[in-house]
């Protein structure tokens, strides 16, 4: 049996080991001081001996030294003692163990179970769509039989548009009449801004960080930036890994401590972690550098579980964290005025916030009341001042050849932006205004309350952080890897049915579209499989309201019958060519076309016209 890469890591017993690198610290302390910065930059550093520059000594004039910048300051390896820190806890660390026993699991059912499920689903997908297409072409006179499958999603979105209009009008009237006012708490909320990284380049990370620093109207809120880096991957074109340039360049000079046993990762092994703290442009930060790659979900479990146990002041329980690491990070928060954490603000390494994005998220969460546990913003494509064309064709290439050139294709930006508008439009706005159950809080722009309903162990560790076993079903395998944002929301609704989520359209974030077709298609595969698997499970998951069950059923059915829907569109085009304007003499056809026009017009205008919730 092949051994997975993570299985090569050795188990470490839960001991408190802090690597100090004292020898390097002593070496740097004994070294002569560096010349002043202005001397180095000016090329006038005096490197000659003290008695060689007297009046009687004439030295040949040497050429001026080249202009160089001083190296970044070395990290300060701190000395941490749990007994003297400002924050202390009584938690213990759970034992290191794999999430399942491979031999036992593989003996229960054959390893070909997933392969059997895969080909069975493909066979069913092809057979059902082929049967529907055959029936459509041979029995098109019975069109009313096929109408529910073709028009169910469209009619649902028309209902969404009408409901959104009524709800928005009602909300506007209540605000103008003074029945609904914004409540500002006496003590500003305290929150942590989390930035997960993997292989982002220097410019992407710096742009994202600066957008967090430049947020307006939140100066009175105590806050901290928490950057967690998953492994040591390099970005294309970078000489060092993302973790290296974050620790040693962008955040150089901070206090650093290394934990050989930091926490128990999702695979059951102890993860070595590097913690660095300091201030970035006046805002306190913590960098959490994981030695091994365990995926974004593992990083989210670490940060969210830590914030919950820190706020809850968990005592005498077993957690994933090394007690020394937990106390050290808790001391950093306490020393920076965050004795409690109200919110977690999440973004991605390739995302840029509007200047008032976080403020709009906070306002939306306040307006919802205590039952609203999370808010997401409006995610748009960052076009980087490029034209809106489908693609750009250089003059040196023929247009037809350039159409097949991956680096010149521009339509993925437009497709990405269109998909964002569709997903954030009618249904998500309906979920925000009417049902109160936005079933996806995108990780690139979200604000979540730190409480048991969102980050408690029952939600986070037992369900969200579940590692699929080899013999789990295909749906469980997909949900254990993809679409962590929508899966987290559905788990919250299932275990805490009274919890609600919202969407704040005025909180805007801009992301970079995939830069190649291979990455774009890979993203589509992950999003489609993850979201549709979650929609399928929501049909049967306990605690989900009936409206969301019905919408999920219609969404999954329409997606499953995609080839049949495309074939019906071709059939309509052929009928339009053959019959011409006679086809519009049918009143039912006119009604269907009007419904489609209303649907797309409503999607196009939802962001500009909708007032805040």
Curated annotation (Swiss-Prot):
Cellular compartments per GO CC: cell septum; plasma membrane
Enzyme Commission (EC) number: 2.4.1.16
Membrane topology, record value: Multi-pass membrane protein
Leading EC class: transferase
Bias kind Polar residues: ranges: 18-27
Top-level taxon in the UniProt lineage: Eukaryota
Keyword ATP-binding part of the UniProt annotation: no
Region listing for Disordered, in residue ranges: 1-73
Protein name: Chitin synthase 8
Gene giving rise to this polypeptide: CHS8
